[in-house]
Amino acid sequence: MERIMVALDGSDHSEKALHLASDIAAKSGAELVLLHVMSDKPLTDAERHMAEVEYLDELASSLDATGIDSGGDPQTRAQRMLQHYADVAHRFRELIGQRLMSQSRARARGRGVRSVQIVLEDGDPAGTILRLAKGLHVDMLFLGSRGLGDAKGLLMGSVSYKVAHLAECICVSVK
C-alpha cells in the first residue's frame, strides 16, 4: 500500500476516518493524502453563524468590504453585490479548509504518519473525491459515513454512498 486518501469535512465521522487512516498509513509507511472539498453552494445558516463568530476578523482583513460601489445602474450594483457575496463565501470556506487541513496534518503526524499531502479543491464532493482518488492512484480511501450535509443529502444520496459505490479502490466508510 503506497497511498491512502481521507476525505475530511470537519464532521465527527470524518475525524474518526482520519484516525483510522492515519494509523494504517503509519503502520504501512503509506503516504496520507488529506482532501477537503469546498462547496460552491450558498452558505448555510450554520456556516454564516460560524463566519460571524469564529472568522470575522480573518474575513474582514482578507476582503475589502467597502469594494461595492453604491452608484450606477441598480442591476449592475446587484450583480456586484452577488459576486461580492460569492467571493466572501468562497474565502470563508477556504479559511475553514485551511484550518481543518492544518489541524488534520498535525493529528496525522502525531499518530506517526511520515508523509502527508494536503489537497483543497472546489466542486462537487463525491465527483471530486472520485476523480482525485483515481488520478492520484489511491490504494485505499477513507471518509465519514455521515458528513455535515443537510437533510437534502438523505433524499439525494449521500457523498459516502456515491463514493463507496463508484470508487475503483478500497473504500472505507467510517461511522
Report each predicted region and the residues it spans.
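Absolute protein N-terminus
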Residues: 1-2, 175
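A structural micro-motif
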Residues: 30, 114-116, 169
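Structural beta-alpha unit
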Residues: 74-141
